[in-house]
Amino acid sequence: MENHSKNGNIIAIITMMFLYAMISFVTNLAAPIGVIWKNVFADSGSANMIGMLGNAMNFLAYLFMGIPAGKLLTKIGYKKTALTGIATGFVGVLIQFLSGKFGADISGFAVYLFGAFISGFAVCILNTVVNPMLNLIGGGGNRGNQLNLIGGTLNSLSGTLTPMLVGALIGTVTANTKMVDVNLVLYIALAVFAAAFVILNFIPIQDPEMGKTTDKTVFEHSPWAFRHFNLGVIAIFVYVGVEVGIPGTLNFYISDTTANGGGFINGTPLANAAAIGGFVAGTYWLLMLVGRLCSSFIADKVSSRMMMMIANGAGMIFIVLAVLLGKSTTVEMPVFTGTSFQMVTVPIAAMFLVLCGLCTSIMWSSIFNLATEGLGKYTAQASGIFMMMVVGGGLMPLVQNFIADNAGYMASYIVPLICMAYMFFYAVAGCKNINKDIPVD
């Protein structure tokens, strides 16, 4: 009986790991698929903004589902909440798949956006449940934390591979490129969601006791009574926009073989530009993975505040260099062109923007730690509000690509530059708790 329970836990852990990866997979699917829709509406004058709409719909779901997801977890428990998220994810990806059947027109695009929105609900629900569920299966403590670190690594790895895989399937964007060209990744997503639902359905998972102290706790105030939390909410909103906007717009930039794009170098368009763009964007996520691994070794020696100052300072320098140098100089990067690995010439701006992945890798946890420090019993409410603010990952890239359409790709990076400047301010002064007189016990 004990062996049966142990084997069940191993299967549950593996399933949760796959879901951890799927969260990043579904989230990072929107930007590379946006290359297809951007091309479909290339003559609209707002192609980049249109291409980023799928990403916007994905993150917009957090605004509506952030707090309800937490309430759902409390009401029906970890397992049923996870199953709800998995089923919702399956439906969302299925709708995106069906959008290809409607054709490359406004009707197909509308169906795709609806699918991206539903997928956003799924990702939000899974984000709410996967972390604590892995901790629960691991028995808490160091073992539970270890499982979450492994899951986070798979999450980053999935974020790295997704734009690369989609880019390789698309190759070079042409007038004939359609949603059906990325059916393989959608099939993979559907299969993983279906398998996870079946496996998890048959695994007994005991929910922890929830809600006993909450009902007895008196809340005289709210997280909004704390200035450093209010400023932290803005910081998390703009951070997610920076994290998504930098590689998403970079993918569009490299995939664009017109004179304005990074895929047009020295008078020659790049062959397989979409594949190269996806790989370059994937390298950004790879550096985020590297940054998270490295920072885990120094987190006990360097404060969140100091890491934020260093990361945002370096990030601003990288963005300024990218904007100033643009395509004036080129560098060679190892990329997969869709057929083989090669050294490919890309604008030097791409290299500096990719390096920003090292900077953004530590920001979520650092902002969360700084913004919730000293909140005590208000921390749970603060977490729900933070989950809603992930919507910044949809809205800020939309603003950035509106600027890209009207003023150029490099000019659009003024958006993440301003956002990083704000986060630098938050680390220097905004994170200080000046409301210590408010009781939090």
Regions picked out by a protein language model, each given a short descriptive name:
Residues 30-31, 162, 224-282:
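Extracytoplasmic gate region of multi-pass secondary transporters
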Residues 52-71, 282-294, 392-395:
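Central cavity-lining transmembrane alpha-helices of secondary-active solute carriers
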Residues 125-139, 360-376:
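Intracellular juxtamembrane helix-capping segments at the cytosolic ends
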Residues 87-105, 313-342:
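C-terminal ends and interior cores of transmembrane alpha-helices
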Residues 64-109:
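Conserved MFS/SLC helix-loop-helix module at the cytosolic interface between two early adjacent transmembrane helices
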Residues 144-204:
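Helix-loop-helix hairpin linking two adjacent transmembrane segments in secondary transporters
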Residues 11-43, 130-131, 246-254:
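Extracytoplasmic
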